[in-house]
């Protein structure tokens, strides 16, 4: 039988006093999770630290791409960010700086940050199976000297996210290996996928 649970709405943002049906075999508590999964190994716990060390710094400096997740009143957002390797600057062992290059001006992430500073980053390095995860709190800076330090071809970013690190740890390469992400044999012919124009046309 289906159970009734309040304040859960799978079709969109949570609605006050909303009630929906929870499908059978749905996990609804941490106790149920703990009964299914073994405790993490000691190395899995020990790899998480609150500041950068030399290996973690090297990973960030080698990365040309990361995803940036944020949270706000309208929900969650995950945004791709990329540039030359090391485009996210290591200010010190506790701080990162990420330039906001000119784009489509949706600025979903920035709108979230001014309301809730919590962010999470996932760094990828081409050819490297391990990834690096950073959790922290961001602020949006328009400091002229900071903007100028990120100028490329004479063009400075509009703003820079300054991120205070709360936690940093590497993720093992299993997901990347299983997906064949860096394997040329797994690469998809772009012409077999819908173009940006086709996706825009199909939005309705």
Language model: regions and residue ranges:
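Binding-site signature for planar aromatic cofactors or substrates
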Residues: 1-204
């Amino acid at each position: 039988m289906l159970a009734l649970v309040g304040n859960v709405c799978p079709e969109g943002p949570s609605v006050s006093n909303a009630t929906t049906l929870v499908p059978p075999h749905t996990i609804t508590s941490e106790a149920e999770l703990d009964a299914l999964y073994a405790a993490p190994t000691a190395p899995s716990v020990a790899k998480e630290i609150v500041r950068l060390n030399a290996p973690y710094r090297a990973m960030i400096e080698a990365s040309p791409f990361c995803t940036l997740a944020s949270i706000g009143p309208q929900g969650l957002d995950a945004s791709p960010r990329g540039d030359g390797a090391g485009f996210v600057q290591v200010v010190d062992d506790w701080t990162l700086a990420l330039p906001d290059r000119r784009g489509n001006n949706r600025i979903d992430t920035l709108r979230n940050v001014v309301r809730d500073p919590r962010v999470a980053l996932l760094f990828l390095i081409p050819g490297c199976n391990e990834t690096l995860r950073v959790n922290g709190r961001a602020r949006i800076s328009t400091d002229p000297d900071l903007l100028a330090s990120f100028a490329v071809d004479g063009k400075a970013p509009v703003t820079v996210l300054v991120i205070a690190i709360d936690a940093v740890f590497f993720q093992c390469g299993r997901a990347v290996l299983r997906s064949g992400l860096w394997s040329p044999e797994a690469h998809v012919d772009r012409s077999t996928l819908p173009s940006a124009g086709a996706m825009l046309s199909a939005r309705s």
